Amino acid sequence: MSRKSKKIKKKVFKDSKYDSQVIAKFVNRMMYDGKKSISEAIVYNSIDLLAEKTEEVDKVAAFSKALDNVKPLVEVRSRRVGGATYQVPVEVREERREALAMKWIIAAARKASGKSMQEKLGNELVNSYNSTGVAFKKREDTHRMAEANRAFTHYRW
């Protein structure tokens, strides 16, 4: 029996503009030093850019599609068995899928050079919507790693 107590999940409130919990989480993940208003402005402007470039009417649906295209289905985890460490492919829980997708999109946008953060994030969201870009490549690499190590699936825990 585990001695560690379970982590209590924080309730994330819906964001004010789109009334979406997912966008609120994204805003929180974008935030630096508690500056939420700046983070909100960046995210909202980049969602507007996404809707404009993809000609999608529903902005929340466009954002959700961009996020869904980056969500990984499987990932590899290290498992030590008798002195050897194996990369064991495991299915990813829905909450972690969402968190990883957000993390990868934001990291890709921050890594891009030039332009404002709104433009960089907007472009990365457009790329994710179209199943291209750095964040989507990260997802594909993760899936490729899991596929390569499929032989070790029996080591799941």
UniProtKB/Swiss-Prot annotation:
MF annotations from Gene Ontology: rRNA binding; structural constituent of ribosome; tRNA binding
A single BP term in Gene Ontology: translation
Disulfide cysteine pairs (residue numbers): none
Signal peptide region: none
InterPro entries reported for this sequence: Ribosomal_uS7 (IPR000235), Ribosomal_uS7_bac/org-type (IPR005717), Ribosomal_uS7_CS (IPR020606), Ribosomal_uS7_dom (IPR023798), Ribosomal_uS7_dom_sf (IPR036823)
Record function comment: One of the primary rRNA binding proteins, it binds directly to 16S rRNA where it nucleates assembly of the head domain of the 30S subunit. Is located at the subunit interface close to the decoding center, probably blocks exit of the E-site tRNA.
HAMAP family given in the database record: Ribosomal_uS7_B (MF_00480_B)
Protein name: Small ribosomal subunit protein uS7
